[in-house]
């Protein structure tokens, strides 16, 4: 048996990142000082886990504001009103989270919604008809490289394709289905880049799988991951679920070629029953909650 964490709290024991952001918004520190604080915080968190003997340490779980927003930004799901701001990439990202009013423009923040059954709120991704969903960012690999420099091999985490698609708001005339292929291709590119740099494990977080799913939802999930996993080579893929059990889609999950599956045994009332009834792949690692 080995130990793993799905993700580590990012704010800091003394709320370092929150305090640094507030200073940045008040123009009391520079962008470089903010990013340095973030880098030091990531280092501290990785070293804590390493010293605790964690076998599978996660990277890309850090965020200045929200992990869903991070994924949307990584994949160019950025409304035009933010792209038009003549500010840095960091400030565009923060404008999506909290709005921007200044000499370079005036935009409101994206909407916020409750993150499943928690008191946390996420930033709702917004795709317009003109949105070209594709891999454009580098955050995941930059933070993996940071940990690697410390001698720590991590498994990067990213909001999964199904969950991101389901959480996304489509504001134009195009239907949500018109974007499915672009979502899948972007995630295939994420996997390919992880493979290219030698990442050993990639974690897809899919909390949306614990919600009620229609037959159409199941088919969409299977189609998305059949395509993504079709690219699989040496980089292993972990499907991580939480906030309940995956009763509507468990049979489909265990038939796909995931190398690891994370299941919730705390809030997942039927998780043990599902494994007993349908079994679990022999060549797949089971990630469980304590």
Please provide the spans of the model-predicted regions:
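Domain-level signal for soluble alpha/beta catalytic cores
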Residues: 1-289
């Amino acid at each position: 048996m080995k130990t793993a964490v799905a993700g580590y709290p990012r704010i800091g024991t003394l709320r370092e990142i929150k305090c640094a952001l507030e200073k940045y918004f008040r123009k009391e520190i520079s962008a470089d000082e903010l990013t340095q604080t973030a880098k030091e915080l990531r280092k501290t968190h990785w070293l804590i886990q390493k010293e605790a003997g964690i076998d599978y340490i996660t990277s890309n779980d850090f965020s200045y504001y929200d992990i869903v927003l991070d994924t949307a930004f990584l994949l160019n799901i950025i409304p035009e009103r933010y792209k038009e701001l003549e500010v840095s990439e960091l400030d565009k990202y923060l404008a999506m989270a909290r709005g921007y009013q200044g000499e370079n423009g005036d935009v409101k923040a994206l909407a916020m919604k409750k993150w499943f059954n928690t008191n946390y709120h996420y930033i709702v991704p917004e795709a317009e008809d003109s949105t070209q969903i594709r891999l454009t960012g580098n955050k995941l690999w930059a933070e993996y490289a940071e940990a690697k420099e410390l001698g720590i091999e991590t498994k990067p985490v990213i909001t999964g394709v199904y969950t991101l698609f389901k959480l996304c708001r489509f504001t134009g005339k195009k239907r949500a289905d018109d974007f499915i292929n672009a979502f899948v291709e972007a995630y295939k590119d994420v996997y390919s880049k992880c493979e290219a740099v030698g990442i050993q494990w990639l974690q897809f977080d899919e909390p949306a799988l614990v919600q009620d799913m229609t037959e159409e939802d199941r088919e969409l999930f299977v189609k998305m991951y059949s395509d993504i996993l079709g690219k699989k080579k040496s980089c292993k893929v972990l499907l991580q679920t939480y906030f309940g059990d995956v009763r509507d889609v468990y049979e489909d999950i265990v038939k796909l070629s995931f190398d690891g599956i994370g299941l919730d045994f705390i809030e997942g009332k039927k998780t043990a029953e599902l494994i007993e009834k349908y079994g679990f792949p022999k060549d797949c690692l089971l990630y469980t909650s304590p």
